[in-house]
Amino acid sequence: MVRCLGPALLLLLLLGSASSVGGNRCVDAAEACTADARCQRLRSEYVAQCLGRAAQGGCPRARCRRALRRFFARGPPALTHALLFCPCAGPACAERRRQTFVPSCAFSGPGPAPPSCLEPLNFCERSRVCRCARAAAGPWRGWGRGLSPAHRPPAAQASPPGLSGLVHPSAQRPRRLPAGPGRPLPARLRGPRGVPAGTAVTPNYVDNVSARVAPWCDCGASGNRREDCEAFRGLFTRNRCLDGAIQAFASGWPPVLLDQLNPQGDPEHSLLQVSSTGRALERRSLLSILPVLALPALL
């Protein structure tokens, strides 16, 4: 099955659809990435590692994850975020989006059933890449271990409900984007420290008919640490900020991303179109709803 699907998925990722006349913003995002030399080069690299080699009967998981991290760390942020958050209405589009976020080679494990969420969590605590924000965040408090979302103090709930202790602004100066007619991309979207794509705890869309995300794990075999496991998994599955981020992109492209994609402000040459609701998004803080999926420059 992998041998048959690998080349097809590779073509889907690289070429998108032949036409985006129907308003498919995932296709528009793919075409925008293809038109950008750096985005296309980095995207081709991770597609070759994650899908090309998997089609030959193997899954170089470490290389796939490394290429995926490089794509999101070095690619133009507006283009990479557009690929991640584009809304989908059909299974083909949704599967392309899933494979863009975390290809199967880097997401699911070798077995048919997902492991306990404690396994990737423990692995992440030992991984240099996965715990990249530990130094900036101070002592790591176990991802809110022992505190279910319903029992956390109000002060904790008021903070960005992303990966507590991991998702923090970078201490480094964020990269500057090309000047455009609108406001610049906010600093925390450009240069965050957080859980990157291509790690053991990176979430993905759980199916092709919704915008829900979750890591490849469950809590069925977590024993007496079931509460810890559910609290960790809930950071992805019960995250109102994350849900709001996806809904915001479904309503229309945020202006800060449109400015990056079309710096000349010429609608005739813009690869992405924004709906009339996009102006309303200009008055919202998109960063307050991007805590989990903001991706850092690690390499």
Swiss-Prot record:
Q: In which tissues is it expressed?
A: Predominantly expressed in the adult thyroid gland. Low levels also found in fetal adrenal and thyroid glands.
Q: Which residues form the propeptide?
A: 279-299
Task: Spell out the residue ranges making up region: Disordered.
Answer: 145-198
GO terms of molecular function: glial cell-derived neurotrophic factor receptor activity
Question: Would you name any one GO CC term?
Answer: receptor complex
Glycosylation site list: 208
Q: Which UniProt keywords apply?
A: Cell membrane, Glycoprotein, GPI-anchor, Lipoprotein, Membrane, Receptor, Secreted, Signal
Question: Where are the compositionally biased (Low complexity) regions?
Answer: 177-198
A biological process (GO) of this protein is: nervous system development
Which residues, per the entry, are lipid-modified as GPI-anchor amidated glycine? 278
Q: Which residues form the signal peptide?
A: 1-20
Q: What does this protein do?
A: Receptor for persephin (PSPN), a growth factor that exhibits neurotrophic activity on mesencephalic dopaminergic and motor neurons. Acts by binding to its coreceptor, GFRA4, leading to autophosphorylation and activation of the RET receptor. May be important in C-cell development and, in the postnatal development of the adrenal medulla.
Q: Hey, which family's this protein in?
A: Belongs to the GDNFR family.
**Subunit comment for this entry?**
Interacts with ARTN ligand and RET: forms a 2:2:2 ternary complex composed of ARTN ligand, GFRA3 and RET receptor. Interacts with SORL1.
Q: What is this protein called?
A: GDNF family receptor alpha-4
> Which organism is this entry from?
Homo sapiens (Human)
Instruction: Tell me the lineage of the source organism.
Output: Eukaryota, Metazoa, Chordata, Craniata, Vertebrata
